């Protein structure tokens, strides 16, 4: 019985000592993040698509906040995100990259030519929003509501059976962009 108590006490002391060491190390070696970069990162859509030229939303936020990168390079976020970043940084809004060609951007959707799909799962691994479903050596398909049209699934496909097609805006496919609607709080006078 005494050997059990010695083991319990020894493990408890080791846990306490290691906990104190980890607590000290977390405070001593803490990395302070730039609060502006954090706020910019919160505004970005977090699709990690790479259309801005950076490998994800966090590196783009760091480039905008610390290095003065253009605020108009986020294609999935569009004008709404660009306006929020401009307001946060107190800079003038800029036209979103690619807006010179089109007045209204067309939503793109990945489509898989299912008879040619070999089920290699490379597109599933490349999709940042998990919009592609399927099993190994089985046909894959794209969930239309989740696809952002980021084009990251096209290049890894060995059979070239994935293509991006434009989706026409119809009453069935149109959705509200709630972030583009300005919201104001109007004070209400209370009568006693």
UniProtKB/Swiss-Prot annotation:
InterPro entries assigned to the protein according to its UniProt record, in alphabetical order: 4Fe-4S_dom (IPR007202), 4Fe4S_Fe-S-bd (IPR017896), 4Fe4S_Fe_S_CS (IPR017900), 4Fe4S_Ferredoxin_RnfB (IPR050395), Elect_transpt_cplx_RnfB/RsxB (IPR010207), RnfB/RsxB_Proteobac (IPR016463)
Cofactor note: Binds 3 [4Fe-4S] clusters.
Main location: membrane
EC number: 7.-.-.-
Coiled-coil ranges from the UniProt annotation: none
Residue span, 4Fe-4S ferredoxin-type domain: 108-137, 138-167
Alphabetical keyword list: 4Fe-4S, Cell inner membrane, Cell membrane, Electron transport, Iron, Iron-sulfur, Membrane, Metal-binding, Repeat, Translocase, Transport
Binding site for [4Fe-4S] cluster 3: 127, 147, 150, 153
Highest taxon above the source species: Bacteria
Cofactor: [4Fe-4S] cluster
Pfam family for this entry, one: FeS
Tagged with keyword Zinc: no
GO biological process: electron transport chain
HAMAP family per UniProt: RsxB_RnfB
Family statement: Belongs to the 4Fe4S bacterial-type ferredoxin family. RnfB subfamily.
PANTHER family reported in the protein's UniProt record: ION-TRANSLOCATING OXIDOREDUCTASE COMPLEX SUBUNIT B
The protein's role, per its UniProt record: Part of a membrane-bound complex that couples electron transfer with translocation of ions across the membrane.
Official protein name in the record: Ion-translocating oxidoreductase complex subunit B
Organism of provenance: Klebsiella pneumoniae (strain 342)
């Amino acid at each position: 019985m005494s050997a059990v108590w010695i083991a319990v006490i020894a493990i408890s002391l080791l846990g306490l000592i290691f906990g104190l060491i980890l607590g000290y190390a977390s405070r001593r070696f803490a990395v302070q993040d730039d609060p502006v970069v954090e706020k910019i990162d919160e505004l970005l859509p977090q699709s990690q698509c790479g259309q801005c030229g950076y490998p994800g939303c966090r590196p783009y936020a760091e480039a905008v906040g610390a290095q003065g990168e253009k605020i108009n390079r986020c294609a999935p976020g569009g004008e709404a995100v660009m306006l929020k970043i401009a307001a946060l940084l107190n800079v003038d809004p800029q036209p979103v990259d690619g807006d010179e060609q089109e007045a209204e951007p067309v939503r793109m959707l990945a489509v898989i030519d299912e008879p040619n799909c070999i089920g290699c799962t490379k597109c599933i691994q490349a999709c940042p929003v998990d919009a592609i479903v399927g099993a190994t050596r089985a046909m894959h398909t794209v969930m239309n509501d989740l696809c952002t049209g980021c084009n990251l699934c096209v290049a890894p496909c060995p059979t070239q059976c994935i293509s991006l097609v434009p989706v026409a805006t119809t009453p069935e496919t149109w959705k509200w962009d709630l972030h583009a609607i300005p919201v104001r709080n109007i004070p209400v006078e209370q009568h006693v």
